């Protein structure tokens, strides 16, 4: 299908069946108007069609191609408004605010009937109402001039730091590879559910496309404090463990390619996943590390010794442990023990009950306490109806919330939100609230040094403590559903 001169797939989510595809053209090129006209001729006109995502096959010289969707018109309109509102929130001046009557949960522990005061950018004081409410809370509010309208009674809700997702690809029908509009939409989808900061994961693509996507992330960061930078999941992956990545785009990380990516990123590249067994894998890990990037071992078929060499060369993360890698075996241990035994390594885990079964999630917390980082690996279909979507240039079918490649059934990312990862850890797996919240806040922040003052976030993130950024969530105490969100002091929900 061709839309506006660019190769594209047109995905029409018809509300009658809640799904429907007008896909690959057969023998002739069709544009969007012809597709819509065909439906009108069948007395089934489609209205309120919206551009919601993009992709670009290898070799295309124009901008990324478009996905057009039609579903619940009111939901689409609501999400457009919500995206605009969240984007505009970062243009507003922050004001001091305070919260009391909450159960505070962060990596340090749990405090009943707790309170917090912020000057609008950072947290200035926290405490417990049972011992110091009349004096310290009111004094802190006066010192930073909190107006009465900006004092929130949490009425027993759970208060946590904002969630930090260091590995996700999109939401709300858009991907982080989709340009500024796609990033804005997908970020809104995650922000609405409590992910206040995010490293934007970019899928495997031709090198020039990857470099262009890195530039887009770089250019957006000054105006969007919620964007922490980019993660390249590809193209330096093992062919045997490619997962849902385009095999035609996988390459060895030669010195020239490393240079091109570092130049294109201009400081916005936070993480890059590399299979260490590739011919230039270890050298590339070392080079990225020296450039200030955190390399990650993943999508690999590395033996134990090679994985250890990767971590010793500077890799500080294991990309979604258990997925897209050789597993544990008593005579061929592989990369997982190398990550688990190394205290320098942060270990990503997708806690959706599908990518990793619950016993293995709990095993991960036992093997590497305080080093498990919940990630979503979420793709464009996140928080959307089941149907047909794209991951890069690859067709994806989503059924029962599970995303698989249409071509071979390989898992193609998730539709998970960190909100769900935390709530299911606490309510279904029996993981302690402190450990679950730590895995979605302090641990991922610490992987990049964001748990201390830095040039990206300014104030540290990951705790509800004085001097930390005003990233604050209020959660329903029964369901752990996100109800209120502040990001960098901005009230975004």
Give residue spans per PLM region.
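Charged DNA-binding/catalytic regions of mobile-element recombinases
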Residues: 1-77
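N-terminal metal-binding scaffold of metallo-dependent hydrolase/deaminase domains
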Residues: 73-142, 479, 490
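Alpha-helical scaffold segments that flank or form the walls of functional sites
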Residues: 157-159, 166, 176-226, 249-264, ...
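Divalent metal-dependent hydrolysis catalytic cores, especially in the metallo-beta-lactamase
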Residues: 169, 184-213, 226-239, 265-277, ...
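Active-site gating loops and adjacent loop-to-helix segments of metal-dependent hydrolytic enzymes
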Residues: 188-199, 238-266, 308-321, 325, ...
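Active-site core of metal-dependent hydrolases
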Residues: 259, 263-385
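His/Asp/Glu-enriched, well-ordered alpha-helical/loop segment
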Residues: 337-347, 365-475
């Amino acid at each position: 299908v061709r839309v506006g001169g660019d190769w594209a797939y047109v995905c029409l989510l018809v509300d009658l069946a809640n799904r429907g595809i007008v896909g690959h053209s057969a023998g002739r090129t069709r544009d969007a108007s012809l597709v819509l006209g065909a439906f009108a001729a069948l007395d089934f006109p489609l209205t309120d069609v919206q551009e919601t995502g993009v992709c670009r096959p290898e070799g295309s010289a124009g901008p990324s191609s478009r996905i057009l969707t039609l579903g619940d018109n009111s939901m689409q309109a609501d999400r457009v408004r919500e995206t605009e509102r969240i984007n505009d929130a970062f243009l507003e001046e922050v004001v001091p605010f305070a919260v009391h009557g909450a159960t505070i949960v962060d990596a340090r522990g749990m405090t009943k009937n707790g309170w917090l005061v912020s000057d609008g950018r950072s947290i200035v004081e926290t405490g417990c109402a049972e011992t110091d409410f009349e004096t310290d809370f009111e004094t802190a509010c006066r010192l930073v001039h909190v107006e009465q309208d900006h004092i929130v009674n949490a009425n027993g809700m759970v208060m946590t730091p904002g969630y930090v997702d260091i590995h996700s690809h999109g939401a709300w029908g858009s991907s982080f590879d989709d340009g500024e509009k796609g990033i804005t939409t997908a970020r809104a989808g995650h922000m609405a559910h409590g992910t206040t900061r995010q490293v934007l994961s970019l899928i495997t693509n031709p090198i020039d496309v990857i470099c262009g996507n890195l530039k887009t992330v770089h250019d957006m960061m000054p105006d969007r404090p919620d964007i922490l930078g980019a993660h390249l999941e590809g193209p330096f992956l093992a062919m045997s463990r490619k997962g849902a990545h385009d095999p035609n785009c996988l390459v060895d990380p030669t010195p020239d390619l490393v240079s091109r990516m570092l130049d294109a990123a201009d400081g916005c590249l936070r993480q890059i996943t590399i299979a260490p067994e590739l011919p230039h894998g270890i050298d590339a890990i070392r080079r990225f590390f020296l450039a200030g990037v955190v390399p990650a071992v993943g999508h690999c078929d590395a033996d134990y010794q090679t994985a250890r060499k990767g971590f010793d060369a500077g890799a500080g993360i294991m990309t979604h442990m258990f997925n897209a890698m050789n597993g544990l075996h008593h005579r061929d241990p592989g990369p997982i023990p190398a990550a688990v035994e190394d205290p320098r390594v942060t270990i990503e885990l997708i806690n959706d009950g599908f990518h990793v079964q619950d016993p293995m999630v709990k095993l991960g917390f036992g093997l590497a306490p305080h080093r498990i980082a919940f990630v979503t690996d979420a793709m464009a279909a996140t928080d959307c109806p089941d149907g047909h979507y794209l991951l890069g240039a690859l067709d994806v079918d989503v059924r029962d919330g599970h995303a698989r490649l249409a071509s071979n059934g390989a898992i193609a990312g998730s539709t998970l939100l960190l909100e769900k990862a935390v709530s299911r850890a606490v309510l279904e797996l029996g993981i302690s609230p402190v450990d679950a919240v730590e895995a979605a806040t302090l641990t991922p922040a610490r992987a990049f040094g964001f748990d201390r003052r830095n040039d990206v976030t300014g104030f540290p993130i990951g705790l509800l403590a004085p001097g930390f950024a005003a990233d604050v969530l209020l959660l329903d105490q029964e369901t752990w559903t996100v109800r209120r969100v502040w990001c960098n002091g901005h009230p975004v929900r």
